[in-house]
């Protein structure tokens, strides 16, 4: 199974570090299960073992828990646009729909909505309304009722709860 994982890898004023626990732990889990068949087209550099100590020191929490957990990467990140058009991937996952919507129109035009997933791990209960209206599966971490969003009720059939994860290699089994 081929999975295209779309997420940002650039710092901004709004997001000054790369670490995003929901996004990162989901990608770590997918990579653990499916290896190189998961292509993070915008490579999440801080998750890979070659991320430098100097860079690590700039991450939220100094990279504790999620950084440098992927030891190898044989993912083919070339010709992503062409691969989307040719439906090369079985699924397309947006790891943080608020932070990165790269290739979104192309994905929506070429993939069945059942093959697209949006993940919203932000610390608020608000939705990206435009994305919610796309009618794809929308995983939401902070999922609780808000009367200010009652106008979105018809779209809630696509919304599912999601929780944080934890990297398997950080769990002490003994």
Language-model regions, residue ranges each:
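Catalytic core of nucleotide-activated saccharide and alditol-phosphate transferases
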Residues: 91-174
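N-terminal pre-catalytic "stem/leader" segment of glycosyltransferase-like enzymes
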Residues: 1-128
């Amino acid at each position: 199974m081929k999975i295209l994982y779309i997420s940002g890898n650039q710092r901004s004023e709004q997001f000054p570090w790369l670490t995003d626990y929901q996004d990162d732990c989901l990608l770590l889990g997918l990579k653990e299960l499916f290896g190189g068949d998961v292509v993070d087209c915008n490579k999440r550099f801080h998750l890979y073992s070659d991320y430098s100590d100097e860079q690590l020191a700039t991450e939220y929490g100094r990279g504790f828990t999620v950084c440098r957990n992927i030891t190898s990467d044989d993912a083919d990140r070339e010709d992503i646009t062409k691969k989307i058009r040719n439906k090369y991937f079985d699924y397309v996952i947006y790891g943080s729909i608020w932070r990165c919507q790269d290739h979104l129109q192309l994905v929506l035009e070429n993939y069945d909505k059942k093959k697209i997933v949006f993940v919203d791990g932000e610390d608020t209960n608000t939705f990206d309304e435009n994305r919610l209206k796309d009618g794809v599966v929308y995983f939401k971490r902070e999922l609780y009722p808000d009367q200010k969003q009652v106008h979105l009720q018809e779209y809630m059939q696509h919304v599912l709860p999601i929780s944080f994860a934890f990297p398997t290699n950080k769990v002490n089994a003994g």
